Amino acid sequence: VGGAPGLIIALLLRMFMPEPVRGALDARTAFSDETPTLKQAIATLWKSVAFRYLVIAFTFAGIAGYSINAFMTAFLLRRYELTLVQASVGYGLMYGATGLLGIMLGGAMADRLGKKDRRAYGWLPGCAHIIAAPLLILALTRTDVVWMAVLIFVPALLYTTYLGPGYSIAHNLVSPRMRATTTAILLAISTLAGLC
């Protein structure tokens, strides 16, 4: 039932929005139009030092994110004596809203700053995480739940800024025919490492 709106939107998009030509906006390069096998994709990605660093960055971000998410509901229950519904729904709504805003903000800022310096796609999320850490500590040490909720907004927003620029880096490392596989591999590695 919860996925029904997404299915409806997907059907509407399929009916009314044309599929863009793959790679139409990419600069013409020596990339092949053939779709590589999974083995070829993994071999290509493993050769890329930039991709390996990206996996490490995504993994550390995943560990931090999964840890905080696993911790927050119990923390809100014990520290502020909220009910389970108040803690889980409140944190879920806040995290969902700040996550969406953080992804959009991170992507937009990286694109803007990246016009002058392509390295912005990497250093912007790194700086955001460095700023977020002490702000998260500040928020979690508040004794008043309202102040905690207000103060946690910024680190929660900053946390997800890595997603847009990070996937952009990954997609720019490979041919258009490898982008979905690259995304899946990056997400699988960082998720598995983050959950372990």
Q: Which sequence ranges carry the predicted segments?
A:
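Loop-to-transmembrane helix entry/capping segments in MFS-fold secondary transporters
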Residues: 84-88, 176-186
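C-terminal transmembrane helical hairpin of 12-TM major facilitator-type secondary transporters
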Residues: 116-166
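Paired intracellular helix-loop junctions of major facilitator superfamily
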Residues: 114-116, 170-179
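Extracytoplasmic gate region of multi-pass secondary transporters
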Residues: 48-104, 158-167, 194-195
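C-terminal membrane-cytosol helix-exit motif in multi-pass small-molecule transporters
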Residues: 3-27
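Juxtamembrane intracellular "pre-TM" segments in multi-pass secondary transporters
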Residues: 21-55, 79-82
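Alpha-helical transmembrane segments of MFS and MFS-like solute carriers/permeases
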Residues: 43, 52-61, 94, 135, ...
